[in-house]
Amino acid sequence: MCQKGFEATSMNDIADAVGLTKAGIYHYIRGKEDLLFEIMSYGMDMVDEDVIAPAQKISDPEERLRTIVERHAKRILEVGGAVTILLEEMSALTPAHRRTIRGRKRAYYELIRRTLEQLAAEGKLRSVDLTVATFSLLGMINWMSRWYRGDGRLSPPQIVKDFREVALNAVLKSPGIVA
């Protein structure tokens, strides 16, 4: 699904990729849409565990934002193109599954927005609209799945460091530098 997209990927493609027959794959899933939902749910589980849960434990909003940006960027570099499924295949889900995934994405959006609201209240946020800033940060991070190549000249830690600086400087008046 990562390479071809949902519509162009057949159940035979999926069965071949996991070393099963087409009939055998139905022992594990009811259909392609159920598999898509499971993939998206797994992606959101990773965000919950690797980004949201650690960030929610941090009371300082600047440190929380830094953690969100770093951890999400690191996760994108680790899973690569698989993120595109979560970003681009929502319309292939049933309405009930779409609501579930949208709700989980919305909770993450709200965490970032609340963090930016706290930074604004402390006078640390640039004079930017919170909705624009929140979607911009999410867009910047998620777009890494499009351009990052593991064989590039920069190491993942260097990319995360540089990305963090770009992202924080985009929204904060004077971000503290953390090596």
Predicted features along the sequence, with ranges:
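Alpha-helical segment immediately C-terminal to the catalytic phospho-histidine in histidine kinases
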Residues: 96-104
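Hydrophobic/aromatic-rich alpha-helical bundle segments in the mid-to-C-terminal region
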Residues: 83-91, 98, 120-166, 174-179
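Short helix-capping/turn signature of helix-turn-helix
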Residues: 6, 29, 87-93
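Short beta-to-alpha loop/turn elements within the nucleotide-binding domains of ABC transporters
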Residues: 30, 59, 154
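Helix-turn-helix
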Residues: 2-34, 38
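Short coil/turn segments at alpha/beta junctions that flank glycine-rich nucleotide-binding fingerprints
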Residues: 3-7, 58, 79, 122-123
